[in-house]
Every structure is written in structure tokens, then in C-alpha cells.
Regions:
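Short beta-strand-centered aromatic/proline hotspots
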Residues: 42, 75-99, 173, 179-193
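Short coil-to-beta transition motif at edge beta-strands of beta-rich domains
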Residues: 22-27, 70-84, 163-177
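N-terminal disorder-to-order initiation segments that are Gly/Lys/Arg-biased
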Residues: 1-70, 94-155, 198-226
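Intrinsically disordered, low-complexity segments enriched in Gly and acidic/Ser/Thr residues
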Residues: 140-187, 195-199
Length: 226
């Protein structure tokens, strides 16, 4: 086993610079998650599998490969900072972590295309957390009604599990783009990660909610005046 592990690492070392997919990215220090970052070189490529479809932007999903096959295992919900165009640094969240049975240190991330903002009920502080919002297809088939075909899709949010997000409740509301509101219908915050006793990522199922008088569109906050 050690022989093949070394051979695999030597092959990667030999080919590492022979690509135009080489980037320097920042990995969040974990676990526990901290607002500290470590830079690593990585190969980046687009994810192409059955889960990426017309309801999702392919550009948002990235496969990451680190050079060191013994890179410390990461976690779902761990954040990464990536600058694809050389100018705009964006935050990504890991949704498919490294596999202990894999011969390489590779995993998948998705771009955080929104920010969760809400008011902490205990102290009134405004909390902000990068997140991904998109559609989770429950079936590959459409539902058919008299008005036409309806996709079996639900809006979901992926966000890191931490002290703040683990307190998100059903019926809690969030605003995006200073006008669009959604309420939480289901919270999945109980799945522990491999080699970690605590949940590392929260998955929220959300549904449309109208803008209410207690909301502050200017601050992009729901239930601000409640």
C-alpha cells in the first residue's frame, strides 16, 4: 500500500505544473471553524454530474484537488476563498468532502451566491453568513397538472453549522436582494460529519414569504421591527 501511495504522489508531483487549472486558494481553518485561512495550490475544474442541471449554474460548482495526498481531511460546510478571474475573491462552501478511501485529496465546493442576514434575538446583533441558495431536485420527473408541468424542486440553503446557524428555527424568515423574502420550512442540522461528532453544515428548506411591515428592506432584514 505504501508503495502505491508513494507512486501516486510522485505522479501528481510530476504533472502538477503541467496545467492551466492551477490556482492558489484559501482554506478555512477547521475544526472547529475559525475565521483564519491558509493558502494552498490547487487544481480547479468544473463539476459535471447528474446533479448539475438547468436549474443550477454549472460555473458555481467546482472540483478541487490538492497536491498533497495526505492533506488534512476537510468538512462539509467548510469555507474556501477562490479568485477565479484574478480580481474578485468569492467564498465557496464544501458540500462533498474528501473521501478517506480516495487516493487523492479532492472534494467539491459551490459558490456562496447569497448572504444570510438576521437579527440575534439575544443581543440584537446583526449576523451575516455566506450561503448557497438553489434548487434541490427531489425527482428527475416533472409533476403534471392542468396548468402544465411543474418540476419536483424545492429551494434549499447550504450554510456552515456554527453557534449562530444552529439556532435557526422553522418559520424563521430571511430576505435577499432587499425585496425577496423566504421562510424556513425544514431544518436539517443533525447530520454529523465523518471524524467529527458535531454537524458541520446546515441545510434549510425554504418557501416564499411576502414582505411584511416588520421587515426592513433597506437593511435586508426580516422581522427587524418585531
Amino acid at each position: 500500500k505504501e508503495f502505491y501511495d508513494e507512486l501516486n504522489q510522485e505522479t501528481i508531483n510530476l504533472l502538477w505544473d503541467d496545467t492551466n487549472r492551477l490556482y492558489t486558494i484559501k482554506e478555512q481553518v477547521a475544526y472547529p471553524f475559525k475565521n483564519e485561512w491558509v493558502e494552498y495550490e490547487a487544481w480547479l475544474s468544473s463539476v459535471s454530474d447528474n446533479n448539475i442541471n438547468t436549474n443550477k449554474s454549472v460555473n458555481d460548482f467546482i472540483s478541487v484537488l490538492f497536491k498533497d495526498n495526505n492533506h488534512p481531511f476537510n468538512h462539509r460546510g467548510q469555507y474556501y476563498k477562490i479568485t477565479l478571474d484574478g480580481e474578485h475573491e468569492e467564498t465557496y462552501i464544501c458540500y462533498d468532502k474528501m473521501n478517506v478511501l480516495s487516493q487523492t485529496s479532492d472534494f467539491k465546493v459551490v459558490r456562496c451566491n447569497q448572504t444570510l442576514r438576521w437579527v440575534d434575538k439575544t443581543n440584537g446583533d446583526i449576523i451575516e453568513m455566506p450561503c448557497y441558495i438553489g434548487y434541490d431536485l427531489s425527482s428527475t420527473n416533472n409533476q403534471y397538472a392542468k396548468d402544465g408541468a411543474i418540476p419536483n424542486a424545492r429551494l434549499i440553503i447550504y450554510v456552515q453549522a456554527n453557534e449562530q446557524t444552529m439556532n435557526i428555527e422553522i418559520n424563521q424568515r430571511f430576505m435577499f436582494m432587499h425585496k425577496q423574502c423566504y421562510k424556513v420550512e425544514q431544518v436539517e442540522d443533525y447530520e454529523t460529519d465523518q471524524f467529527c461528532d458535531n454537524p458541520t453544515m446546515v441545510k434549510l428548506y425554504i418557501a416564499y414569504s411576502p414582505l411584511l411591515a416588520v421587515d426592513n428592506a433597506e437593511l435586508n432584514l426580516c422581522d427587524y421591527y418585531s
